[in-house]
Amino acid sequence: MAIALEYVREIYYRPLLQLVYEAQTVHRQHHPPGRVQLCALVNIKSGRCPEDCAYCPQSARYSTGIETYPLISLESLRQQAMAAQRAGATRLCMGAAWRSAPAGEAFERVLEMVRLVRKLGMEACVTLGMVSAAQAQQLAAAGLTAYNHNLDTSPAFYPRIITTRTYRDRLETLAHVAAAGLQICCGGIVGLGESDEDRIGLLHVLANLTPPPTSVPINALVPVAGTPLGQLPPPDPLLLVRTIATARLLLPTAQIRLSAGRKNLSESEQALCFLAGANSIFTGERLLTTPNPGQAADAALLEKLGLQPL
């Protein structure tokens, strides 16, 4: 049965401390308390993307000074994956700055990357832009665990952030992923200039995906100079907490991943996010092209909070 927009709105606007308490209660019913999955994100192809996502430094339309490079080698991926695994990561996500996954040799190499990561005993996730039904089937056959394709924001606010790909395009890719039997990894970004109603709209769509996402990355905008949103301030951390808590109540069995923007959060603010139901983080010095707390800082934080890696 579909989850009503008004139901999502009612949850979102609950008093914050009550909302966090309820989210943590539900979290403990479905997940081991005090356990956090560590993930790593490898940028397997950087920059020169033809799209116009207003937040993204990898767009070829903006001058952001990022390092650009073509699809990396299998050996480079192997070294990065093994380093992440030694640091405690059990899931590796591979991101490529494409509008759509390409055909031919590049896609074949991605399939080899998936097989490599799975042979190491890690979960494998990729985010390659839009994929066809046939490509989703090939990724599943290679052993892919999950496909990431974020919705970013509400259907209403979306055209103000991206014009080169429609919301329907994104939902179509998610349908291909689901039809292939892959897990859906899908979330959004807080701090794009959206309203509370836009965050509610995003959560409403996420809660009604069929099947529901098993992984929900909640990102805080990292403003990057040169992008259209580069002058925005980082979002209020309590908006992030409210969004995470609402997501936890709507998607009780999902991994809620506290993703981009952690570098701008204090330890106390990150602790509130965990209390609100986040149970996964990305480790390493960078998330694609933006800074991220390093592994040493994350290890110290988890120890301070009494959290253990899954």
Curated annotation (Swiss-Prot):
One of its GO terms (molecular function) is biotin synthase activity. [4Fe-4S] cluster binds at C49, C53, C56. It holds the Pfam family Radical_SAM. GO terms for biological process: biotin biosynthetic process. It comes from Synechococcus sp. (strain JA-3-3Ab) (Cyanobacteria bacterium Yellowstone A-Prime). Keywords: 2Fe-2S, 4Fe-4S, Biotin biosynthesis, Iron, Iron-sulfur, Metal-binding, S-adenosyl-L-methionine, Transferase. [2Fe-2S] cluster binds at C93, C125, C185, R257. Homodimer. The keyword Transmembrane helix does not apply. InterPro entries: Aldolase_TIM, BATS_dom, Biotin_synth/BioAB, Biotin_synthase, Elp3/MiaA/NifB-like_rSAM, rSAM. The gene is bioB. CDD domains: Radical_SAM. NCBIfam families: bioB (TIGR00433). Its cofactor is [4Fe-4S] cluster; [2Fe-2S] cluster. Gene3D superfamilies: Aldolase class I. Its EC number is 2.8.1.6. Pathway: Cofactor biosynthesis; biotin biosynthesis; biotin from 7,8-diaminononanoate: step 2/2. This is Biotin synthase. Belongs to the radical SAM superfamily. Biotin synthase family. PANTHER family: BIOTIN SYNTHASE (PTHR22976), BIOTIN SYNTHASE, MITOCHONDRIAL (PTHR22976:SF2). Binds 1 [4Fe-4S] cluster. The cluster is coordinated with 3 cysteines and an exchangeable S-adenosyl-L-methionine. Binds 1 [2Fe-2S] cluster. The cluster is coordinated with 3 cysteines and 1 arginine.
